[in-house]
């Protein structure tokens, strides 16, 4: 089974899937369009969240970073006048250093991800969507800004006029992603932000065509017609669709099975169920529902 994931929503589903499927049967391809270099190291927020979730290290209060991490280095940098865009924990930073060292030595992001996966003892396969650089750029009245500047530094306050993926036209799917598309019969599009998390993955050359003969399942990130979290509604409006499940499908494209919340207004063919995943039990129940659909 191939899972397409961002850094929110889908990791909660993953913690359920690994309890009902052999983890070795799961391949996760993760959005990298929100990556950025901070203090000399490459931070891959969505990849890190997926890796830490699969390693049972994720801070489930915030759904980013490592549970119980300290922030000594981040605090000391602030004290000496170094401003970091993200709050980076000390253990979290160690993996950023490993990733960056691999890349500086000529390796790819996929190579670095594999080293981290092995170090954490993760049995599932995890790949970046691409080894090429892609950046989500948000257009606002204040000008264009990287997603992390918009969401973290400016707390998502500026008006969103547009969203684009810089570098997407030249980027290729990672070799691990290509192989997974050849090998897997089922693709699950996780409940991550459809615009900034899933759309970059689907926009890579050849991905939609390669999914055409797969069994496809999409889990809506909306609770009724509202996102569970984050700025998804504003991004959806910025790309010209309504922030409802019909809008989600217009971004994702047609799928074989579309799972929505019980309160969704979606008029098309879908499976209505409880899509909240506030607990491991809820995540596991939804994972079982997906397995039932794909046989």
Where are these regions (language model features)?
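Short, flexible loop segments at boundaries between secondary-structure elements
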Residues: 33-34, 214-229, 275
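Active-site glycine-rich loop that binds ribose-phosphate moieties when present
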Residues: 161-180
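Electropositive, gly/pro-rich neighborhoods at or near active sites that engage anionic ligands
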Residues: 30-165
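Gly/lys/ser-thr-rich phosphate-binding loops in alpha/beta enzymes
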Residues: 1-49
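Short internal beta-strands
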Residues: 27-31, 215-222, 257-262
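C-terminal functional extensions of proteins
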Residues: 229-295
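Charged helix-capping and loop-helix junction motifs
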Residues: 200-209
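Short, conserved loop/helix-junction motifs that constitute active-site signature segments
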Residues: 19-24, 208-214, 252-253
